[in-house]
């Protein structure tokens, strides 16, 4: 498949488009700031948005580096505790039919950590190309409207194309804004909870929660598993681990299933089945980056398909209700 074979080209390009939306969304917040009754100019706001993004990017890398290096030192201790716990579980009646030794051998913490770090490395490996693409997109924005006028001299066609682009911009920016807020809120609550329980590497687990919540459906599930799993190896008793697991699930459910739908409303208008299939498709051909980019790609595709009679039926299938974007 072309998309899979050219992943090194397309992934940074799509990431750059998403990053561009992130930057202009942050810049719009800076533009709301008034200094002596004057709003911050767009150029300065965009520069501040770039600095903000770079700050959080390097903060993310620093947190991962510090926590992973510290965790690797204590990894043998955690591995021994996990195997001891699994062997103790053999005494439980309904577990006796399970091959405990095989299960113990299959659970490798170093492999789990390697997978997490590998996923992060995959994303960061595209950093240089993504930043370069983003720079050129920012430079092209200045002449974008002029090019649209030249490409579509017919007034009606130009209005239609401009309307499609405007809807894409509005929905993607709103998605970035709401999803970032929801993920940050979830991560903050999980971080406080982990601190209260005394779980080690709370900052790392909170960061992982923030990042994974951008992956639809399965991201929050994965984020709910790791902190209790590692707390199980830290605490002597199972009771606090179970309470911690329940509270994390409550946080994820309350925000993901109650707050987020209220904030999103009918913004995305995507079928849950379409999201699941899209997640599987883009995850298969582009791996973890594809999972993160699944929603923006589906939103853009849905709006474009809805505006052409030959592809309108695809938009109907992608939409979450009878009203097509």
Q: Model segments located where?
A:
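Juxtamembrane membrane-interface segments in integral membrane proteins
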Residues: 26-34, 55-131, 141, 147, ...
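Generic alpha-helical transmembrane segments of integral inner-membrane proteins
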Residues: 2, 43-56, 127, 131, ...
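Hydrophobic transmembrane alpha-helices
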Residues: 16-19, 23, 134, 207-214, ...
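Membrane-interface starts of transmembrane alpha-helices
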Residues: 36-45, 154, 158-161, 219-222, ...
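Hydrophobic alpha-helical transmembrane segments of membrane transport and translocation systems
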Residues: 241-325
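Alpha-helical transmembrane segments and their immediate interhelical loop/hinge regions
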Residues: 123-230, 234, 238-244
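Anchoring transmembrane alpha helix of integral membrane proteins
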Residues: 1-63, 299, 303-325
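Transmembrane helix interruption/hinge and helix-loop junction motifs
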Residues: 2-10, 195-201, 217, 235-238, ...
């Amino acid at each position: 498949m072309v998309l899979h074979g050219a992943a090194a080209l397309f992934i940074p390009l799509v990431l750059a488009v998403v990053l561009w939306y992130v930057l202009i969304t942050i810049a719009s917040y800076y533009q709301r700031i008034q200094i002596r009754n004057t709003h911050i100019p767009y150029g300065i706001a965009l520069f501040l948005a770039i600095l903000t993004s770079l700050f959080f990017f390097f903060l993310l890398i620093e947190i991962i580096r510090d926590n992973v290096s510290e965790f690797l030192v204590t990894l043998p201790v955690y591995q021994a505790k996990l195997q001891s716990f699994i062997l103790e579980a053999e005494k439980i009646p309904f577990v006796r039919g399970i091959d405990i030794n095989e299960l113990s051998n299959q659970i490798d913490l170093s492999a789990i950590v390697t997978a997490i770090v590998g996923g992060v490395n995959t994303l960061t490996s595209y950093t240089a190309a993504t930043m370069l693409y983003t720079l050129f997109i920012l430079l092209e924005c200045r002449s974008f409207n002029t090019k649209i006028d030249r490409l579509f001299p017919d007034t009606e066609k130009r209005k239609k194309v401009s309307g499609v682009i405007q809807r894409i911009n509005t929905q993607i920016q709103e998605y970035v804004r709401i999803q970032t807020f929801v993920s940050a809120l979830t991560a903050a609550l999980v971080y406080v909870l982990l601190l209260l329980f005394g779980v080690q590497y709370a900052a790392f687990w909170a960061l992982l929660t923030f990042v994974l919540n951008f992956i639809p459906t399965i991201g929050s599930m994965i984020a709910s598993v790791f902190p209790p799993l590692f707390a199980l190896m830290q605490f002597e008793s199972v009771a606090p681990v179970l309470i911690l697991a329940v509270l994390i699930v409550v946080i994820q459910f309350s925000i993901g299933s109650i707050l987020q739908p209220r904030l999103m409303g009918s913004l995305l208008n995507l079928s849950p089945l379409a999201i699941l299939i899209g997640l599987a498709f883009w995850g298969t051909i582009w791996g973890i980056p594809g999972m993160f980019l699944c929603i923006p790609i589906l939103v853009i595709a849905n709006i474009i398909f809805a505006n052409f009679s030959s592809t309108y039926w695809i938009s109907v299938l992608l939409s979450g209700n009878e009203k097509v974007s």
